[in-house]
C-alpha cells in the first residue's frame, strides 16, 4: 500500500475500515462501563456521565499527541527525511511523558471542583472523583500508547491499534464485574473498579504497541542520541499538538455547559443524556475512522507536494461521511425508543434518552463536515485552524446556546433544537472555508515545519 500513489477512494476505505472497527470496540468499551455503572445505581450512572468531560482532558491530550506525531512523521515519510522521522518519533515520546505529568496534576487537583460546577450533589461528586482520580493516575499509559502508535498511523497502519482496542474491550468485559462486584479475594470496589479495569487494559495496550513499534524497520537505526531533547522538534510538536489539545479540550467546556443546563431538570436528565451520547458515539465511529485515514493520507501527500491528491482525499471523505450519517440518522430516529433500554430501566432516564436521540438524528449529517475538515487542517500541520474551529464549536456555540436557552426559558427539547441549528450553521460555514482554502491557498501554504 502506497499512500502517495494508490487510488484515493481505495486508500480511504483501506485505512478507515480498520480504524472504524477499532474505534467501534473503543466505544463498546465505554458502553460496557456505562452499562455496569447503571447496574450500580442511577447516581453512579450520572457520576460516570459527568466524569466524561473531565476524563476527556486525557482524550484531548492523547488526540493532540497522536495527530502531531502522525502528521509530522507522515510529512517526514513523504519527504523521505529519515533523520526527521527518528527525531520526531523520539521527541513525541518525550513530549508525551512531560504532558502526562501535567495532566495528572491538574486532574487530581481540580476534578472535584468541576463536579460541583456541574451542579452535582455530594454522592455523585464522591462517586465521580473516586473514578477520575484513578484514571488520572494512569494517564501516562493512555498518552504513551498513542505516542508510540503515531509512527504506525503515519505509515498507514491502522490495524495494530484496531487489534489493541479489540483486546482491551474483551479485557474490560472480564475485569469490570470482577472489580465492581468483587471476586474471590478482590473486594467490591464499585465505580473505582471501573477505573481499575480501564488502567489494566491500558497497560496491556501499551505492551502490545511497544512490541510492534520495536519491530518497525523505520526506527532500527534509532539510538539514545535521538532522545536528547532538541528544542526544534519539541517546539514543532508542541505547536502542532497543543492547539489541537486545547481546542478539543473545549469539548469539556461544552459538555459542562450542557450538563449544567439539563441538570436544572434533574439528575435523570443527565443520566438519560449521558446514556444517549454513548449511542451517538457508536454512530459516529465511521466518521472517526475516515478522519484517521485522511490524516495519514493527506500528511504524506502534502509532504510530497501532491496537492491534487490532498484535494481529492478531502472531497471523497466528505461524500462518504455524508452518505453514512444520513443513513445513520434515519436508523437512530427509528430506534430511539428501543436502544436506551440497554442502559437503564428507569422510565425518566429512558424518556430523556429518547428525546435527545430523536433530535440528534437531525444533527448527525453535520458532523462529518466538522470532523473531516478538522482532520484536513491537522494533516496539513495547520493546527491553528483546527483550534479555531473547535473553539467555535466547543466554547462559543455552547455559551451562546446556554444563554439563549435561558433567555427563552427553553426546556430539554428546545435546548437541543437550538444546539442543532448552531451545529449546522457552523459546519456549513466550515465547508465553505475549506473549499476556499483548497482553491486559493493550498499550494501556497507554509512549509516551515
Predicted regions and their residues:
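Helix-terminus/linker motif at the lipid-water interface of multi-pass membrane proteins
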Residues: 28-46, 115-122, 180-189, 249-276, ...
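Short runs within selected transmembrane alpha-helices of multi-pass transporters and secretion channels
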Residues: 66, 135-153, 161-172, 194-209, ...
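Alpha-helical transmembrane segments and their lipid-water interface positions
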Residues: 26, 30-33, 37, 59-66, ...
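Transmembrane helical elements of multi-pass membrane transporters/channels
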Residues: 14-33, 134, 145, 168, ...
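Transmembrane alpha-helix boundary and packing residues in multipass membrane permease domains
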Residues: 19, 23, 34-35, 71, ...
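Short alpha-helical transmembrane segments in multi-pass integral membrane proteins
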Residues: 1-18, 73-140, 188-242, 298-363, ...
Amino acid at each position: 500500500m502506497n499512500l502517495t500513489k494508490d487510488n484515493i477512494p481505495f486508500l480511504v476505505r483501506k485505512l478507515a475500515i480498520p480504524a472504524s472497527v477499532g474505534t467501534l470496540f473503543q466505544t463498546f468499551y465505554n458502553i460496557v462501563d456505562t452499562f455496569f455503572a447503571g447496574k450500580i445505581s442511577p447516581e453512579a450512572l450520572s457520576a460516570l456521565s459527568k466524569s466524561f468531560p473531565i476524563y476527556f482532558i486525557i482524550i484531548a491530550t492523547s488526540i493532540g499527541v497522536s495527530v502531531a506525531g502522525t502528521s509530522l512523521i507522515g510529512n517526514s515519510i513523504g519527504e523521505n527525511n529519515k533523520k526527521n522521522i527518528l527525531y520526531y518519533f523520539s521527541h513525541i515520546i518525550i513530549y508525551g511523558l512531560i504532558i502526562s505529568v501535567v495532566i495528572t496534576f491538574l486532574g487530581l487537583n481540580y476534578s472535584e471542583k468541576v463536579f460541583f460546577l456541574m451542579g452535582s450533589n455530594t454522592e455523585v461528586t464522591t462517586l465521580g472523583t473516586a473514578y477520575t482520580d484513578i484514571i488520572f493516575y494512569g494517564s501516562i499509559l493512555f498518552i504513551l500508547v498513542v505516542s508510540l502508535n503515531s509512527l504506525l498511523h503515519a505509515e498507514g497502519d491502522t490495524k495494530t491499534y484496531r487489534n489493541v482496542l479489540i483486546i482491551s474491550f474483551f479485557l474490560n468485559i472480564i475485569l469490570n464485574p470482577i472489580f465492581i462486584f468483587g471476586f474471590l479475594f478482590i473486594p467490591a470496589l464499585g465505580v473505582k473498579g471501573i477505573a481499575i479495569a480501564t488502567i489494566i487494559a491500558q497497560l496491556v495496550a501499551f505492551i502490545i504497541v511497544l512490541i510492534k513499534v520495536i519491530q518497525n524497520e523505520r526506527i532500527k537505526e534509532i539510538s539514545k542520541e535521538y532522545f536528547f531533547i532538541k528544542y526544534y522538534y519539541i517546539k514543532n510538536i508542541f505547536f502542532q499538538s497543543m492547539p489541537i489539545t486545547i481546542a478539543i479540550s473545549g469539548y469539556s467546556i461544552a459538555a459542562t455547559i450542557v450538563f449544567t443546563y439539563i441538570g436544572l431538570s434533574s439528575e435523570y436528565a443527565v443520566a438519560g443524556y449521558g446514556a444517549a451520547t454513548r449511542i451517538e458515539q457508536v454512530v459516529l465511529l465511521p466518521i472517526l475512522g475516515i478522519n484517521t485515514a485522511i490524516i495519514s493520507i493527506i500528511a504524506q501527500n502534502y509532504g510530497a507536494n501532491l496537492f491534487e491528491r490532498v484535494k481529492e482525499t478531502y472531497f471523497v471523505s466528505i461524500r462518504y461521511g455524508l452518505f453514512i450519517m444520513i443513513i445513520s440518522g434515519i436508523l437512530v430516529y427509528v430506534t430511539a425508543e428501543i436502544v436506551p433500554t440497554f442502559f437503564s430501566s428507569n422510565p425518566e432516564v429512558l424518556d430523556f434518552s429518547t428525546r435527545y436521540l430523536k433530535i440528534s438524528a437531525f444533527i448527525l449529517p453535520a458532523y462529518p463536515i466538522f470532523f473531516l475538515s478538522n482532520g484536513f487542517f491537522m494533516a496539513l500541520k495547520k493546527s491553528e485552524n483546527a483550534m479555531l474551529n473547535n473553539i467555535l464549536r466547543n466554547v462559543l456555540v455552547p455559551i451562546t446556546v446556554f444563554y439563549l436557552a435561558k433567555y427563552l426559558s427553553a426546556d430539554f427539547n428546545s435546548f437541543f433544537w437550538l444546539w442543532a441549528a448552531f451545529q449546522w450553521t457552523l459546519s456549513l460555514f466550515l465547508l465553505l472555508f475549506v473549499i476556499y482554502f483548497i482553491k486559493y491557498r493550498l499550494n501556497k501554504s507554509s512549509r516551515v515545519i
